[in-house]
Regions:
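Soluble catalytic domains of membrane acyltransferases
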Residues: 59-132
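A transmembrane-helix-recognition feature enriched in membrane-embedded lipid enzymes
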Residues: 2-66, 114-115
Length: 132
């Protein structure tokens, strides 16, 4: 019975995760459309939506985030890191308003690529000298 419950719980979390991604994808599309696709008007709202999305994903996936040290809140800054897994993106994105830099290939990924585009991700083509 426990194995069946664990399987059901994992499938339930996966379903919630997919629903959450679709909800934020549609929300981003609506916001971009309402403001006529003008990035200067939607950048703050988009960053806030991306942060809320990351926090909700962490909660659904059972990820607990603990901050230690001298955390200064939402100040401007530039964070450079080499993440170990895709969960790192959720954790970092849920802590502060962020705009991510990503490889250009991510843009073509279904669902997550679309979310990255809506979140104003900066895409870098690492195959060209100009892009890298």
């Amino acid at each position: 019975m426990t194995a069946l419950y664990n399987l059901f719980f994992k499938l339930y979390r996966l379903f919630l995760f997919l629903c959450l991604n679709i909800f934020f994808l549609l929300s981003g599309l609506i916001i971009k459309t309402l403001f006529f696709l003008r990035e200067e008007k939607t950048a703050g709202t988009t960053a806030l939506l991306a942060m809320l999305w990351a926090q909700a994903c962490c909660r659904i996936l059972g990820i607990r985030v603990t901050l230690s040290g001298n955390y200064q809140g939402f100040k401007l800054g530039f964070i450079v890191c080499n993440h170990i897994s895709y969960l790192d993106i959720l954790v970092m994105g849920g802590i502060r308003l962020s705009i991510f830099v990503s490889k250009i290939e991510v843009k073509k990924w279904p669902l997550l690529g679309w979310l990255a585009v809506l979140a104003n991700t900066i895409f870098i083509d690492r195959k060209t000298k100009k892009g890298a």
